[in-house]
């Protein structure tokens, strides 16, 4: 699933949008292959960057694609999981992709 958001800079109100435009935030959670393809075609990036960002085994890193001016940040975010009734502290990667003026 993915949703796009746009913020009106005059009112500072963020709303969901269906239009691909400069400055949008694109939030992707477990997107289908078709959704990944659609987003990549509309904003002009490689599918690999989104797939890296969605990989639960990715390590924290920064990757720069100079051909299309895209930057991928993978950060490890702390989470608490319950295993056998006990709290276990772990990390989960979150991917942030900067594409010119779009963020995924």
Go through the PLM ranges and name each one.
Residues 1-104:
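Peripheral, non-transmembrane regulatory/ligand-interaction domains of membrane transport proteins
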């Amino acid at each position: 699933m993915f949703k796009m958001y746009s913020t009106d800079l005059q009112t500072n109100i963020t709303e969901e949008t269906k239009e691909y435009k400069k400055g949008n935030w694109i939030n992707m959670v477990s997107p289908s292959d078709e959704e990944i393809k659609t987003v990549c075609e509309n904003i002009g990036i490689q599918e690999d960057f989104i797939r890296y960002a969605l990989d639960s085994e990715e390590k924290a890193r920064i990757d720069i694609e100079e051909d299309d001016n895209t930057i991928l940040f993978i950060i490890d975010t702390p989470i608490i999981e319950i295993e056998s009734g006990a709290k276990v502290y772990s990390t989960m990667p979150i991917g942030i992709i900067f594409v010119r003026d779009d963020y995924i």
